[in-house]
Swiss-Prot record:
Protein task: Component of the general transcription and DNA repair factor IIH (TFIIH) core complex, which is involved in general and transcription-coupled nucleotide excision repair (NER) of damaged DNA and, when complexed to TFIIK, in RNA transcription by RNA polymerase II. In NER, TFIIH acts by opening DNA around the lesion to allow the excision of the damaged oligonucleotide and its replacement by a new DNA fragment. In transcription, TFIIH has an essential role in transcription initiation.
Pfam families in UniProt: Tfb2, Tfb2_C
PANTHER family for the chain: GENERAL TRANSCRIPTION FACTOR IIH SUBUNIT 4, TFIIH, POLYPEPTIDE 4
Gene Ontology molecular-function annotations: ATPase activator activity; double-stranded DNA binding; RNA polymerase II general transcription initiation factor activity
Xref: InterPro entries: Tfb2_C, TFIIH_p52/Tfb2
DNA repair in keyword set: yes
Organism: Debaryomyces hansenii (strain ATCC 36239 / CBS 767 / BCRC 21394 / JCM 1990 / NBRC 0083 / IGC 2968) (Yeast)
Keyword set, alphabetical order: DNA damage, DNA repair, Nucleus, Transcription, Transcription regulation
Subunit structure of this chain's protein: Component of the 7-subunit TFIIH core complex composed of XPB/SSL2, XPD/RAD3, SSL1, TFB1, TFB2, TFB4 and TFB5, which is active in NER. The core complex associates with the 3-subunit CTD-kinase module TFIIK composed of CCL1, KIN28 and TFB3 to form the 10-subunit holoenzyme (holo-TFIIH) active in transcription.
DNA repair as UniProt keyword: yes
UniProt-annotated location(s): Nucleus
Name the UniProt record assigns to this protein: General transcription and DNA repair factor IIH subunit TFB2
Gene Ontology annotations of biological process type: nucleotide-excision repair; transcription initiation at RNA polymerase II promoter
Amino acid sequence: MSSSNLFKATVNEHLEGLPKQVQSRLYEAPATCLSIYRLLPPIAKFYIMTMLFYETPVALKDLDKWCKPTSRKFQFDSLKRLRALHLIEEDSSGSHIRLHPTFRQNFRDCLTGSQARNAFGNLSTTPDEQSVSIKFLDSFALQKWESILHFMVGTELSVTPSNSVLSLLKSGGLMEGTNKGGNRLNITNSGFQFLLQDINAQIWTLLLQYLNLTQDLNMDPVDVLNFIFILGSLELGKGYTVSSLSETQISMLADLRDYGLIYQRSENSERFYPTRLATTLTSDSAALKSPSMAMEQALESTTETEEQQNLASNSNQGTIILETNFKIYAYTNSPLEIAILNLFVHLKTRFSNMVCGQITRESIRNALYNGITADQIIKFLETHAHSQMKILAKERLDKKIEFDTSNNINTAGGAPQSQMMTNENGTTVAQHKLEVLPPTVVDQIKLWQLELDRIQTFEGYLFKDFASQQEFEALSNYASEIGVLLWSNKSKMKFFVTKDGISQVADFASRNQRR
């Protein structure tokens, strides 16, 4: 399996693939409008906030004035997202745009507090006889979610996940086989990739598969998706009444309990509590990074005493030390973390609180054959790197910046090391990169992947037969600026653009011809 065939199951792709009529129904819910806004890139958010209180359409040419020339690629990507979601509508001439009227009205109501009382759920006004703490909710969510992951890696469990969870894992292609008799399900290639995703992506993967099954369950997919977005806007630690939910949403509660997204004292309870897994569904927070350690961080951060906080600071540290000789040491006794490491590390020795192993060509190739990518492996190692590795990396970076600045040393690209650059958010960041992992190991893992990815294919369009070199350079430079240029040959005056970029380049060529 080529590693270019990445595991894609994001909420953004799902939303963009919905019919326009379904998208319009989604925008009738203020909570959904807010959640979709949170999922947009920064420039798209800026466009929405700028046009939100405009009573007249905005000229497309004015959008260029709102962004720096260096941000044209981000502008192109943002407009592409807004068009796919039908959040912007063009007039008949194609020269002006405006926000989708339903989205505009409900998002304005959301920001001004004019939405309906139950738009974000109804808080329970009666006190609970047995109070539910945030610490308890985190513990409940951790137990539910990790039981799913442990089952996937084959850990022996006293209580296996519910049949609905097992069916979802199987229908989603994460596991295969039969769950009759002894729950004999085996993890698939997609399941291997799933394990290395961050916890938010994992949850969305299951929720989107759940959405795909709504028709078989006779459930309204819009109602289901709206409730998921409402959960992402609720307050952690608060109880909400069930009476304000629709029949479809009430029927979802049992499944959401199995995933650890909500807690109910009993099936017939008149209130439910969203867990941290639910309230961070549309959040930009990076607090929940991994299946186990990130949830443990959330658990420990809610403790109140100084002694418990000290224990939390110790447990929040990463567990993995990676040496330049490819040897790896993981200070953990978690069966789940050890099982995940075993996916791409040749483990040799196990102690009571540590495992030792080595990253080899064979272990990485086995992971690649199972559909795991080099970037996923590197990201996992960076996320779980021991705090001492991060401290040493920071010290090396500080020394390098100090040395390069004092000696006015330039980078390979010719820019001074002290030079700053602008990112997508419009803020300036240094060009230096914090290298937590040994660069030699990172490069070698990528090279082992390149051994399998010698040929890559792309869908797109070839431009050729230009009248002049000037015309070729104008179009190819524009395609490069907006990030859709895949290949160019100056001597033959040919270039190749992505499938998504053809319309933009063609429009630019038409405008040039009319001049």
